[in-house]
Amino acid sequence: VGWKEDFNMAVRCPVPSQESAYRYADSILDRTERFLSAKKSPDIMIGGHSKGGNMAVYAAMQITQSDIEATNERAQRLGLLPALGGSVPGRNCRISRIFSHDGPGMSQVMVHSRAYQAIAARIDKTVPESSIIGMLLQSQIKPTFVKADAISILQHMGSSWQVTQSGEFEQASELTGGAQLIGKTIDGWFDRVSQEQRERAINQIYDIFAAAGYGNIADLVAHWTDSLPKIVAAARGTDVQTRELIK
């Protein structure tokens, strides 16, 4: 858990926290059944920041996948062909919105799955204008860009996001040039290397960030003047490919 799992999310799915998020969201749907109105159960909204945003999307996907499997089983019993696309009837329909605030995406396999496509229109993805974390992996969701008063990776801290007098996020038009370059570099690296190379590099990057002595990215960013020199020193001991990625 912690740093190790954060980095494992880049090469594995699911990780334990994603499964925990699914069980929790599923239990909320169960518990709110008792608040039945005259005709329907109440809708819910789920979401989170950073890894929490990814976990919220995963939880909604798994609830939807359970509905897909139940629908296919009913179709099979009735001798009907299973539906291949479109909305999925079931408990997932009670999830009205899924918020991912600077949360990383999913693998290509996941975002092309029927479960993901069924919930995609309900995902509200918000990232700061210099986002790095939130632009990792795939999402197929056009995010809302938010102005922030920090620089680069420090914008991951939600406290730097600007809010208008009416209480809405102050929107930016697009990612900064620097964030776009970093995103293209990381995506290009993932496309070039094998799964084995990715896992080895992820393990090395984990060791580098762990050397800073902080348990999560929020603490590392908050104490960047202390953590950055330690990260640079630890990076010198990695292989060339990993050093190039960090640069």
Residue ranges and their predicted role:
Residues 48-52, 56:
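Gly/Ala-rich beta-loop-alpha elbow adjacent to hydrolase catalytic centers
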Residues 1-43, 61-247:
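Alpha/beta hydrolase fold serine-hydrolase catalytic domain that processes acyl esters and thioesters
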